[in-house]
């Protein structure tokens, strides 16, 4: 699968950003940028065009839930699918992500197949 969609990967750990970026690239999604927290992500989202956000939940300054809320209340950004990626597998986090408008949720560690499947499913639901 190859597509020209642009991804923003948000995680406070550079190693995790690099892993997600490489997994996306291996899945045919080669256009990606990175941000270290929700504040940096919002700045990039408001100043560049992105098609998909993959974000960690637990980050300093602005966590993934706060970032999701900011994206969903912004008229120019609310259409963006947001995939929450976290080490937390708590039911309340999964429910909060869904209620907040996240397009999906996966738990670390995950495989390339899991990430690719979730991204592809979200894109199909969006008609992309």
Residue ranges and their predicted role:
Residues 43, 65-78:
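Short amphipathic alpha-helix used as the core "switch/output" element in two-component signaling
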């Amino acid at each position: 699968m190859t597509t020209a969609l642009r991804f923003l990967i948000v995680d406070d750990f550079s190693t995790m950003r690099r892993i997600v970026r490489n997994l996306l690239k291996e899945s045919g999604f080669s256009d990606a940028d990175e941000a270290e927290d929700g504040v940096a992500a919002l700045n990039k989202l408001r100043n560049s065009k992105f098609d998909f956000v993959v974000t960690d939940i637990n980050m300093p300054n602005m966590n993934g839930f706060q970032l999701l809320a900011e994206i969903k209340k912004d008229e120019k950004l609310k259409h963006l699918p947001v995939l929450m990626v976290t080490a937390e597998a708590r039911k309340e986090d999964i429910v909060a992500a869904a209620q907040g408008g996240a397009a999906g949720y996966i738990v670390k560690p995950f495989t390339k197949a899991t990430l690719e499947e979730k991204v592809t499913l979200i894109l199909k639901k969006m008609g992309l």
